[in-house]
């Protein structure tokens, strides 16, 4: 298996961070660290989604030509 976590695992990790921070019972230093980790995960997930969107925007027509669709 790849050393890079799959999208779903990273999303679950981000959701767990958000939950911990929303609960408000995290010490300040840990909250800052978790927030930073969450921001990195968020940016990485966004990049993954954008790449997937670019891939899905192009559809092959029956004759093999690409049809560019509005995103």
Curated annotation (Swiss-Prot):
UniProt-listed InterPro entries: Exonuc_VII_S, Exonuc_VII_ssu_sf
E.C. code: 3.1.11.6
Quaternary structure (record): Heterooligomer composed of large and small subunits.
PANTHER family, sorted: EXODEOXYRIBONUCLEASE 7 SMALL SUBUNIT
GO CC aspect terms: cytosol; exodeoxyribonuclease VII complex
Family per record: Belongs to the XseB family.
Location in or out of the cell: Cytoplasm
Keywords: Cytoplasm, Exonuclease, Hydrolase, Nuclease
Superkingdom, taxonomy of origin: Bacteria
Predominant location category: cytoplasm
The protein's name: Exodeoxyribonuclease 7 small subunit
Organism placement in taxonomy: Bacteria, Bacillati, Bacillota, Bacilli, Lactobacillales
UniProt cross-references to Pfam families, sorted A to Z: Exonuc_VII_S
Gene3D superfamilies: Exonuclease VII, small subunit
Gene Ontology biological-process annotations: DNA catabolic process
């Amino acid at each position: 298996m790849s050393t890079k976590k799959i999208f779903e695992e990273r999303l679950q990790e981000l959701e767990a961070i958000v939950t911990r921070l929303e609960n408000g019972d995290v010490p300040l230093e840990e909250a800052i660290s978790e927030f930073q980790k969450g921001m990195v995960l968020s940016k990485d997930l966004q990049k993954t989604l954008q790449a997937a969107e670019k891939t899905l925007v192009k559809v092959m027509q029956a004759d093999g030509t690409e049809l560019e669709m509005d995103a």
